């Protein structure tokens, strides 16, 4: 009985949450071509791998990724693979 009362009261809200969660993208690897383009930039700028905002926008456009994905890729790449001189 309590379950039914709660479902009646909050059912719409829960359905909305369920739908919202199902819309979210699943985590996964970036497309291979995008990774290759980012790695190419990385290799050319290894000594100082901090792209400017303009470079990030250009990379986002050429890779088809969001600027936030570009930003996160560089943060992770520097953390995992960059040893400043």
UniProtKB/Swiss-Prot annotation:
Keywords: DNA-binding, Homeobox, Nucleus. The keyword DNA-binding applies. Probably binds to the DNA sequence 5'-TGAC-3'. This is Homeobox protein knotted-1-like 8. PANTHER family: HOMEOBOX PROTEIN TRANSCRIPTION FACTORS. Belongs to the TALE/KNOX homeobox family. It comes from Zea mays. It holds the Pfam family ELK. One of its GO terms (molecular function) is DNA-binding transcription factor activity, RNA polymerase II-specific.
């Amino acid at each position: 009985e309590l379950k039914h009362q709660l479902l009646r009261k909050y059912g719409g809200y829960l359905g909305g949450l369920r739908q919202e969660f199902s819309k979210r993208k699943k985590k996964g690897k970036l497309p291979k071509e995008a990774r290759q383009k980012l790695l190419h930039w990385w290799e050319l700028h290894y000594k100082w791998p901090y792209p400017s905002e303009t470079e990030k926008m250009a990379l986002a456009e050429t890779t088809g990724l969001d600027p936030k994905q570009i930003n996160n890729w560089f943060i992770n790449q520097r953390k995992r693979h960059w040893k400043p001189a």
